[in-house]
Amino acid sequence: MPEPATKRILSGVQPSGKLHLGNYFGAIRQHIALQEQGDAFYFIADYHALTTLKEAEAREADAAQKAGKTTWKSAREILAENVRDVALDYLALGLDPDRATFYRQSDVPEVTELTWILSTVTGMGLLERATSYKDKVSKGITPTVGLFTYPVLMAADILIVRSNLVPVGKDQVQHLEMTRDMAGYFNQAYDDVFPEPREMLGDAPTVPGTDGQKMSKSYGNTIEIFAEGKALKTAVMGVVTDSTPLEEPKNPETCNVFALYKLFATAGEAAQLAEQYRNPMLNADARKGRAFGYGDAKQLLLAKIDARFGPARERRKQLAADPVTVEDVLRAGARKARAEARKTLALVRQAVGMAAAPAE
């Protein structure tokens, strides 16, 4: 099958909780930019979320019980809330439904049909080599069939709309290689239906968490994108620093606060702050003669976060107050994605000798 004439970009985001700065600089910022560069498809991966939903419910119950509560959110409530949050977050941060196709994975049921068909040409050995499966099981995720066959569903997500470009992090390259393998298995067994998707490896920075490790929900060290007020200040002021005395020179290159500040600042602003680290008494008059400390740097970081995400927070509040509009966006995206999916499945069914799908 010939590849689309233009760039067809696809990426999914799993609804697994509040988005944080690591998500933004690692993926979301790139996704928003890519909607201007090709035919972009972005989906909320609620089918994928089912593989870890019970663990999410257990964490919710554990947190509630530790807080002395007797009720907590069910798995169903967690999934619905997380899907809604992803939709609100992406739209507030600049995803434009007039430029990109934005939809829920579960609103395109053709994906599950293609998943089954791909599974019939995919060897067990390929899936057994998936490092993400082993990693998740080692972290206590229940080893279900769904978790084991996760790469097949991911391949179906990509191939169902004949995407040829997929923005991924380095930890996801293996899944895309497996997608190419599955596309090749099908094309060789039946007919040349699928294009060969290629990875788009961005230069996403490693975002440090509040404890200095990579920012991740699993480490509990995140700064949420849409946190504000006291919650945001508490997170920023909790960023770990060393014990260098206030009046002593400090090394910006080993400081978590400086690393976070650089993500928001211009090169000139970062250079200024670095100089302030090295010369704590610089501009001391503005601080009533006091040396510059990590607390001052955290205040600068806090101001940068507010400046970057303040307008998006307001947009998110407006969208949250209008759930019908958000649902309309997702439904419209699903209609467009399903139109592409049906074209692909028609060719797949023809290739394997199945009858055409009944008209709806």
What do these predicted ranges mean?
Residues 2-10, 15-156, 268, 307, ...:
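N-terminal Rossmann-like or analogous alpha/beta NTP/dinucleotide-binding catalytic cores
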Residues 15, 166-167, 221:
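A generic structural motif
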Residues 21-23, 63, 174, 180-360:
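Conserved nucleotide- and phosphate/pyrophosphate-binding catalytic cores
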Residues 73-76, 166-169, 247:
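Short, polar/flexible loop-turn hinges at active-site or ligand-entry regions and domain interfaces
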Residues 90, 171, 212:
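Conserved RecA-like P-loop NTPase ATPase core
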Residues 101-104, 167, 244:
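Short catalytic-loop micro-motif centered on adjacent basic/acidic residues
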Residues 135-182, 186, 190:
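Internal, conserved structured core segments that host functional sites
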